[in-house]
Amino acid sequence: MAVIESVGANTTVEAGGLISPSPPSSVTSQESGASSNNDHGGNGIHDEIGVHVARSDGGESFKRDMRELHELLSKLNPMAKEFIPPSLTKPVVNGFNGGFFAVNNGFVAAGNFPVNEDGSFRRKKSFGQQGKRRMNPRTSLAQREEIIRRTVYVSDIDQQVTEEQLAGLFIGFGQVVDCRICGDPNSVLRFAFIEFTDEVGARTALNLSGTMLGFYPVKVMPSKTAIAPVNPTFLPRTEDEREMCARTIYCTNIDKKLTQTDIKLFFESVCGEVYRLRLLGDYHHPTRIGFVEFVMAESAIAALNCSGVLLGSLPIRVSPSKTPVRSRAIPRHQMH
C-alpha cells in the first residue's frame, strides 16, 4: 500500500535546505593579535628577572637559565595534536592501511590523517547538533560571519557517499557541528557544507582538497554561506521515526506539471516501491518539493542517484531527508 498526499498553499516546508553555494572567500586568521599580546606581557616579566639576577652575579645565571629554557622549548612540536584519551574516541571508519581507509559502502579514500592506534580517526565527539548555537533570524551579523568562517564548502562528492561518511573524513581535523549534503541538478556529483566548532578546524580541513572519497577527489574551499538550520519540531522523535528517515528522500525543483502518480511511477520504476509520497507547493513558486518514503532503505539510497535527472521539464534535486513523513489526519489518496 502506498499513501500519497499533496499539500497546497500556506504549508510549512522543511527548513532543512542549504543556502545556495557560491564561490568561496578566503578565511582570515585572528590568532596573531593574541600571540602578540602574550609576547609583550612576557617581556616585562623577563626584564624584571634580568635586573634582579644581574645585580647578584652579573647576569650569568640568568643567561644560563634562559639558554636551558630555550633548549627545552625548541624540542616541543607546536603543531602537535591535542591528546585525546582512547575512551573518548571510537572508530568512524575501518580498514586503515598504508594511508588508505575504507568507508562503510566499500569505497576507498586516501590521505594522511591523524589516527589512533586502532586505525580510527582521532576525535573528541561525533558530529551532531552540539557545539555552537545554530543560526536563526535573530542571529547578529557578527555571529553569522563567525559561523561562515567555521564552515567549508565541499564539491564533487560521489552520489553514494553519505553525510556520516563525509563527516568521518573531516572529523579527524576538528569537531564537526553539522554536515549537509545537497544534490546538484547540473552534475552527477553533489556538494556539501561542513561546519566546525572553530576556525582552526575549518582552515585545517582545506588540506583535504583532492582527497579521493568514493570514485572522485573532493574539492574543499572556504564557504561564503552557512548551513540553514532545520526546524527542531520536524526532526525525528523516536527510533521508528529515525528508521523512517533512512527510507525517505527530500526532492526539490519538481515540475508543477507533474502529477503525484507521475512522480510515484518514476521512483518505483528506478528505485523501488514507494510507501508514502507528500508534495508541497504554493501559487508563488514555480516548482514544488516533495518527500518520498520508500518501503526499503536501499531504495532511498538508490534514489540519490536520480539527482539531476530530467523529470518533466526540470532536473530534480534529491538528498536524504532529515525529517520523517508524518501522517496527516486523513490521507487524501490511498493507492494499493
UniProtKB/Swiss-Prot annotation:
GO CC annotation: nucleus
Gene3D superfamilies reported in the protein's UniProt record:
3.30.70.330
Residues annotated as domain RRM: 150-225, 247-323
Q: Which InterPro entries match?
A: CID8-like_RRM1, CID8-like_RRM2, Nucleotide-bd_a/b_plait_sf, PAM2_motif, RBD_domain_sf, RRM_dom
Enumerate the GO terms in the molecular function aspect. Answer: mRNA binding; nucleotide binding; RNA binding
Region described as Disordered: spans on this chain:
14-47
Q: Where is the composition biased (Polar residues)?
A: 25-40
Expressed in which tissues: Expressed in roots, leaves, stems, flowers and siliques. Detected in flowers only in growing organs: gynoecium, petals, stamenal filaments, anther walls and ovules.
Residue positions of motif PAM2-like: 75-85
Disulfide bond annotation, renumbered to this chain: none
Function according to Swiss-Prot or TrEMBL: Binds nucleotic acids in vitro.
**Subunit (UniProt):** Interacts with MPC.
The text the record gives for the protein's domains is: Contains a PAM2-like motif, which seems to be involved in the binding to the PABC/CTC domain of PAB proteins.
Q: What is this protein called?
A: Polyadenylate-binding protein-interacting protein 12
